[in-house]
Amino acid sequence: MVQVTVEKVGLDQDGEQAVVLLADLTKTTLIPIWIRALEASAIALPLQGLTAPRPLTSDLVISVTERLGADVVMAIIREVKDGAFYASLVLTKNEEEIEIDCRASDAIAVALRRASPIYVMERVLVEAGIRSEEDNVQ
């Protein structure tokens, strides 16, 4: 697995689709994940240090997780199938590791809110990654 960070979140001109750019820690490889604008907002808010006036789905997931006595350990982007990214959240409770299947956008939003690391599997980096120089990312 390779650790990544959210490099950028942007909307298309219509404002209906968005892209989240994940970057490896050296910022030499980017992974664009196309998502809806609503999911982009859920990812952008914690990056800007903001919170929504009412809980979003990611906030709900965190609240339920905490109320059940579990902790969010990490998010993992596991694979790409037909352009869709498959992910999971890894939780711990009483030293037991629990993996929950979810959308990549939800995994990223939850991980950002908990300051948990985000990882991608090597094959995802190979299949979906774009080589880039840091000064080309704007």
Predicted features and spans:
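Divalent-cation
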Residues: 1-138
